[in-house]
């Protein structure tokens, strides 16, 4: 991340506002008690089809989505989630297993209230630098809708469609969804609308910022729950779209 000091200074100012107090990031970049995720490499890329029958998925460990950021207590029948990650030099691949008893996608415009439908959210910080990213590409917060679009805020401070960064597919099996996603990884010099943006080529040993969440709505005007994979010790619990210091670390492991 470029200009880290200025970025963190801005973030501290935002979180110092009344009602938004939060602990300072450890060592200026990340908060305490972050999860250390690991992703095995895939000799052959999984097919993104919601079936997940490739043997490479057996090498990856499940990680829970079980931290309630917003909303009331929920039952395991209402929501349960877990995920695993693998990688190739071109992309990372995420397999998510979701229990959601009611699926909602009521906002037909993909750029309007996309967080209030059932949404898989994947947070990525290419260089694990932390800091603010709400209207920059220091990190990405991809909101995956049930129609497999990926939305994030752009540098113009408006929602943008980043579906060209990803592949997404899900299938329903009884009370569960298997949701597979492939994501190109971009550095913080990404420029919206530029024709020459190129994904980062991935290598073993690379460490990125990473976090997963799910917005659950069972029929209300607004989402009813927001559940993530990282704890938030203080301050607003739903600020992952602003603060990459909340992300865990994702290390890309050598092929076994």
Predicted regions and their residues:
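Structural preference for beta-rich elements and adjacent junctions enriched in aromatics
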Residues: 21-256
């Amino acid at each position: 991340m470029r200009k880290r000091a200025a970025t963190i200074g801005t973030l501290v100012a935002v979180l110092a506002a009344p009602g938004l107090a939060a602990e300072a990031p450890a060592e200026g970049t990340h908060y305490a008690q972050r999860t250390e995720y690991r992703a095995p490499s895939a000799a052959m890329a999984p097919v993104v089809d919601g079936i997940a029958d490739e043997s490479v998925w057996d090498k990856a460990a499940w990680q829970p989505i079980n931290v309630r950021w917003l909303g009331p207590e929920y039952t395991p029948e209402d929501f349960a989630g877990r995920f695993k990650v693998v990688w190739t030099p071109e992309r990372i691949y995420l397999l998510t297993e979701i229990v959601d008893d009611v699926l909602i996608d009521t906002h037909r415009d993909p750029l309007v209230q996309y967080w209030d439908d059932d949404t898989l959210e994947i947070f990525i910080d290419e260089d694990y630098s932390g800091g603010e990213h709400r209207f920059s590409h220091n990190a990405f917060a991809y909101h995956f809708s049930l129609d497999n679009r990926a939305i994030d805020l752009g540098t113009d401070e408006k929602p943008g469609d980043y579906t060209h960064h990803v592949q997404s597919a899900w299938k329903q099996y009884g009370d569960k969804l298997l949701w597979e996603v492939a994501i190109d990884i971009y550095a913080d010099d990404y420029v919206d609308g530029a024709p020459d943006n190129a994904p980062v080529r991935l290598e073993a040993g690379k460490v990125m910022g990473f976090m997963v969440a799910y917005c659950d709505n069972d029929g209300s005007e607004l989402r009813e729950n927001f559940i993530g994979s990282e704890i938030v010790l203080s301050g607003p619990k739903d600020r992952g779209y602003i603060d990459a210091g909340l992300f865990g670390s994702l290390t890309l492991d050598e092929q076994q």
